[in-house]
Amino acid sequence: MANNKNIFLIFSGLFVLAGFSFFLSLSTGSNGMSFVECLQVLLGNANENSELIIKSIRLPRVLAAIFIGAGLSASGCVFQAVLRNPLAEPLTLGVSGGAVFGAAAAVVLAVSTFFIPLFSFAGAFLAVGAVYALSRKKSFDSNAMILSGVAVSYVFSSTVMLIYSMSSAHQIQAAFSWLMGDLSTVDTGLLIISAVIICAGIAVLSMFGNIINVISLGEQKAQTLGINAQKYVKLIFITASLVAAVSVALCGVIGFVGLMIPHIMRKILGGNNIILIPASALGGAIFLPLCNAVSRTLFAPVILPAKIITGIASGIFFMFLLSRAK
């Protein structure tokens, strides 16, 4: 467990890394720019062409990466603590599967691409409702919720495959970039709304940090300390699901961010969720913009979906952990 001085230093380092990640991702693209040029654009001291590139194209993409990374990581941290399961994250709890189903439904109904994130959000919350209903009979047991999430994901994935098998190539292409987690497709209006919801959700979850600490000890221990575990688990689960659903709906399924970042922060800071939740949010806000920068430079001019980079990075990280385990 890190002491107060170390916590301050760690958070200071995270903020510095967040600034570096922001400017690195902002400077990355077909027209390379230095950090100084990016700063000049943000301060309004650059030429019109640079301002157009940064403010209209890159800035929304980078901000989307920051808020999505923060939302997925914070919600993953909470899911792991409340369910006492290290594999709990939006992907394994059915949130991502529901979001994909919503996007597929939007494609079949031939709605505007602007509405794909809205359909995705509805699908994500449909999945959350299904997991909630299935695990309710088991008093929201952590294993029951994980199994319910996996089952719901399989059902939605199969349904999506059925929908796509009956769709035209044009319809499938309409949602392809979203399904691949393409950060460049974000709508500015939706980004602003999503950012407000994500930040508010993370703030609420952080306020529940002490209660989450008690719940993570087990239901009996929580009751001994006078806390109604089931009541708080419902409230916290719904809040974390809202943050995750908004994050996924904004730019598509970007897996493993909510799984890996909380593990890293827990190893650095310990298990106190009062500091772990905001630290995980900061870690995600650093990690996803970095993945965005890598995805645009690794095989340039070919641009890879960010989810490919997050998946590779997470796989390498967990293989490293397994190789070090005694």
Segments predicted by a language model, with ranges:
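Alpha-helical transmembrane segments in inner-membrane proteins
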Residues: 1-326
